[in-house]
Amino acid sequence: MAILGIGTDIVEIARIHTVLVRCGERFIDRILSPIEYKQYHQQNNSVHFLAKRFAVKEAAAKALGTGICHGIAFVQFELFHDERGKPQLRLHEQAAQLARERHITRMHVTLADERYYTCAMVIFEGDIRSNDYSIQPNWYLSKIKP
């Protein structure tokens, strides 16, 4: 098992609020999956809810190696929590297909948020031997030898 992708994102919550005021439902529809959309309308602090999902989806797209482009959209990533409250990701459509092609078998998600910012990190793991990545296992040894 090897790390195949790492992505991180930090979001200023006030920026999400500004975009939400300016764009309204268009922004929400672009970011949230149908399940998240239902949850969003049940939240007391909907801006924080939206900011967390925005950060996680940006981080996940970076971990895939694409960012939000090339057919990968925010709505293709869905944040949910397991029975213990641990954040998890569910991938849909092109994001799920790309994860299968890259043999990603495990996903790790972590979130941190404060009053003004929210931060997310996503790590994808899988079998490196079944990927196209050209890794030189001892590249660092030649860098540190005198």
Curated annotation (Swiss-Prot):
InterPro entries: 4-PPantetheinyl_Trfase_dom, 4-PPantetheinyl_Trfase_dom_sf, ACPS, Ppantetheine-prot_Trfase_dom. Keywords: Cytoplasm, Fatty acid biosynthesis, Fatty acid metabolism, Lipid biosynthesis, Lipid metabolism, Magnesium, Metal-binding, Transferase. It comes from the Bacteria. GO terms for biological process: fatty acid biosynthetic process. GO terms for molecular function: holo-[acyl-carrier-protein] synthase activity; magnesium ion binding. Mg(2+) binds at residues 9, 58. This is Holo-[acyl-carrier-protein] synthase. The lineage of its organism: Bacteria, Pseudomonadati, Pseudomonadota, Gammaproteobacteria, Candidatus Palibaumannia. The gene is acpS.
